[in-house]
């Protein structure tokens, strides 16, 4: 299996990247990123690219893959305007899905959304993510993942409070609706690809259940 990852420098994406590199069933991992990765691996191909609305010159990264794992995102607390949050959350994902549809029409597009996403929700971030899920499912039959707390790779992009609270948040591990390891999120995405799972919204407890099927 060949997979393409976005957001490999982030907490969720970094965990998914390492999971894919360690997976016996994955023979090539491609990552589109704005800056070089610290990690090197024989399976890994990195495409440095700065414009996430246009993919001229890196279309080959999308060609011949079985899955695109879109882990790119930002906390709404880290941007000052809804327009900026919408561009990062919605527009970047839709642009990538359009290129994937053209280059690898049979590939599965995975989008990391989040627990509490609701298209008519009270909060701006929930509405934007809900609209993104809707548009991606219409465009490419995307599989949309709604994890709660992702216990993933430490990232400089995390809000400082989240970094401080991470050890305490691990106390949520016994609660299937509230906690998932980054590794398990990666395993669930690979398992869903193998099962050709499309056009679904998957909540945290089901993520853990799908991950438990991986490799069995």
Predicted regions and their residues:
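N-terminal Rossmann NAD(P)H-binding glycine-rich loop of SDR-like oxidoreductase domains
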Residues: 2-25
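NAD(P)H-binding glycine-rich loop region in Rossmannoid oxidoreductase-like domains
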Residues: 3-4, 38, 45-95, 99-102
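Oxidoreductase cofactor-interface core, primarily capturing Rossmann-like NAD(P)-dependent enzymes
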Residues: 22, 27, 42, 118-215
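Conserved Rossmann-fold NAD(P)-dependent oxidoreductase catalytic core, especially the SDR/UDP-sugar
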Residues: 23, 35, 74, 79-127, ...
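Short, polar loop motifs at secondary-structure junctions
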Residues: 31-38
């Amino acid at each position: 299996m060949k997979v393409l990852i976005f957001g490999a420098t982030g907490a969720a994406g970094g965990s998914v990247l390492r999971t894919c590199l360690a997976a016996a069933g994955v023979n090539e991992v491609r990552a589109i990123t704005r800056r070089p990765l610290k990690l090197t691996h024989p399976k890994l191909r990195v495409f440095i690219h700065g414009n996430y609305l246009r993919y001229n010159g890196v279309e080959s990264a999308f060609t011949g893959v079985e899955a695109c794992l879109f882990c790119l995102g930002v906390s709404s607390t880290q941007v000052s305007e809804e327009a900026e949050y919408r561009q990062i959350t919605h527009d970047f994902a839709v642009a990538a899905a359009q290129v994937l549809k053209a280059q690898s029409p049979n590939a599965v597009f995975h989008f990391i959304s989040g627990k509490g996403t609701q298209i008519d929700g009270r909060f701006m971030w929930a509405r934007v993510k809900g609209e993104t899920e809707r548009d991606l499912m219409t465009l490419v039959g995307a599989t949309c993942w709604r994890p709660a707390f992702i216990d993933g790779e430490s990232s400089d992009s995390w809000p400082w409070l989240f970094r401080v609270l991470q050890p305490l948040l691990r106390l949520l591990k016994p609660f299937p609706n509230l906690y998932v390891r980054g590794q398990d999120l990666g395993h669930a995405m690979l398992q869903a690809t193998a099962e050709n799972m499309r056009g679904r919204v998957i909540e945290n407890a089901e993520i853990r259940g799908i991950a438990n099927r991986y490799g069995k």
